[in-house]
Amino acid sequence: PFGVLSEYLEVPGGTYTIEVVAAGADPADGAVIGPVDLDFASGTTTTVAATNNLENIEAQVLDDAPMPAGDTAQVRVVHFSADAPAVDIAPDGGDALITDLSYPNDTDYINLPGGKYDLEIRPAGSMDVAFDIPEITLTDGVSYSVFAIGSLADDSFTVLPAVDAAVAGVRVGHFSADAPNVDVYANGGAILEDVPFGALSDYLFVPAGTYTIEVVAAGADPADGAVIGPVDLDFDGGTLTTVAATNELAEITPVEINDKRVKPAAEGAKVRVVHLSANAPKVDIAPDGSKRNEAIFKNLKFGQSKGYTKVPAGEVDLDIRAAGERAK
């Protein structure tokens, strides 16, 4: 029925021919919308909406948030009411958060602290309230879309808040020095190809869930055997994770690292060090030429990461020393 937004449907990436028909009708007798070809890339989340009145019905395609802000909620507003004018969105009686939003556009996501919000819709540039949005509760680390839908002409205009898909950010590092270039597969599909030693991918944003990961020599068929895997890894919504191939090829080991979201330092920078050299001893990380007790990170062993530490901004020369060793 009108006003319904489905749950996300998980489908393989690719091109899909979409048709919308009256309930119970045969597509061969004619579609309300379509057939239309839509491309959905792997690892993305998309909303497809039917808008406008029946005579002028059209399909709108929205790219949903790739990743929510970790310490706030993330919200966008979507104007899908074809006969409604351009509008401003504001807290009850307050200054507008969003201005001059017109059909069929959507805003960028804006970050808001979690909590309860009373919002109102006003004609663009006016303080007059056209519609009071029922109280919305936002949770930190979650992305939301607020859809303005329906028609002013038949009084079907309403607002539909919705939670966007939970998304995880994952990046992959090849840190096994004697392993060949590799391809990385997730749930049977290649996500990275011909990855050399020392490479760290950008974050890949994927729907939260469990993924079966396999790493094979570049160009090889996973059916012929994997360098790593198959192994099932869980990625929760709103998280960032680094998955690294470490150790020598004969004992290659995947390591998962939780990439915590941290607020940037007011002054300076924040740095984390991860020890992923399997045959290296425990180490200290220190400014070049500094004393033993001036090490920034101490006694770091293989597979261990030290939390983000504030350091001065600018170029810094660092030494890696055996744990407890003096500068040479």
Question: Where are these predicted regions, by residue range?
Answer:
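Intrinsically disordered, low-complexity polar regions and short flexible loop motifs
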Residues: 1-328
